[in-house]
Amino acid sequence: MFIGRERELTALQNQYNSSKFEFTVIYGRRRVGKTAIINEFVKDKDVIYFTGVESNEKQNLENFSQSIMSYKSDLPQGSEFTSFQDALEFVFKLAQEKRIVLVIDEYPYVAKASKSLASTLQLMIDKHKDASKLFLILCGSSMSYMEDHVLAYKAPLYGRRTAQLKVQPFEFMEACKHFPKFAAEDRAIAYG
């Protein structure tokens, strides 16, 4: 059961409804619900969902290829992209036909393993943003990495995002929704 986070879900839905290229950065501390928000948002949408792993570029590219193939099942079995640029080019072109959400969760893991990923994303966004209906979501828990390498003025992706969401822990009243049968004092204790 998903409770709360109406503000975040509304913001994402408003961007989705625009039907043009959108790029949202979602970040915040670990375990605050970033992935849960994304999962709730995409549950009724065409989505390519890729979660980066703390590994090397080859492993992440294989996993990204698998995510694309899970979405586009008519690709030959065992198909793999030879680079992130090829994979992203394919996704951007797919999204010329219809609205697709591309989620790259744990983005810092992928970007650290593939040093050129940010500039490749920059190139693909600049090349395809006017023709593509892609809704790109980059999500990460390493707040310093997201702020310094995605949101900062000197970062390759600076100026390309159309929104950012810094996910905070639940406020008391929102957290209370998780414990509807608790007495007020017990809710306060549960909240911490």
Residue ranges and their predicted role:
Residues 1-192:
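Phosphate-binding site recognition
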